[in-house]
């Protein structure tokens, strides 16, 4: 299968509580390819990107705007390449049915983050949940929730926390190639 998603994400980094969290929400996109090996287990590789925003208490990292005496807004670009192990809970607990309207698919993820505006390279780990709605034999509509964690320095600021991360909600579509069902 191949798919594409768009949505909104928020980077959760140092000093997030110092400013308005709503100012940190930015657009995100993702394209992916994958294969279901059984009706329950599948693998997916994805590539996406977004402009992350955050806050800093000093003019450091990717500060671009002073919002208070000791508070700056920051922004930087991130590319994310990841692999996911997916488990179709609906097929696992309710049995396989090709024409099922809805499937619940949680996954675990490992990935690589590359800073566009810096030379930061970080590994990431994550979890997600795909709400898959069947449109027809070939197409699905997806509502996906995901979260990732990574090392403290991805935002260019070492703030004393061990981890930072991001959370996203996306909507997208998946096209399933021929051989769309499983024989029993």
Each language-model region and where it sits:
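Short glycine/proline- and aromatic-enriched beta-strand/turn motifs that initiate or cap beta-hairpins
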Residues: 1-34
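Sequence/structural signature of outer-membrane beta-barrel proteins
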Residues: 9-16, 52-54, 92-94, 111-117, ...
């Amino acid at each position: 299968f191949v798919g594409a998603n768009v949505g909104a994400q928020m980077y959760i980094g140092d000093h997030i509580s110092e400013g308005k969290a709503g100012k940190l929400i930015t657009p995100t996109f993702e394209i992916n390819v994958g294969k279901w090996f059984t009706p329950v287990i599948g693998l997916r590789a994805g590539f996406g990107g977004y402009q992350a925003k955050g806050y800093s208490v000093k003019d450091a990292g990717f500060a671009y705007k002073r919002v208070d005496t000791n508070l700056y807004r920051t922004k930087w670009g991130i590319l994310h390449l990841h692999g996911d192990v997916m488990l179709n809970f609906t097929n696992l607990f309710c049995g396989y049915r090709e024409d099922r309207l809805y499937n619940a698919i949680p996954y675990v993820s490992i990935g690589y983050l590359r800073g566009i505006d810096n030379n930061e390279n970080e590994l990431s780990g994550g979890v997600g949940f795909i709400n898959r709605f069947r449109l027809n034999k070939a197409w699905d509509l997806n509502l996906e929730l995901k979260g990732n964690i990574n090392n403290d320095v991805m935002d260019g600021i070492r703030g004393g926390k061990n981890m930072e991360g991001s959370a996203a909600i996306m909507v997208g579509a998946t096209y399933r190639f021929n051989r769309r069902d499983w024989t029993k």
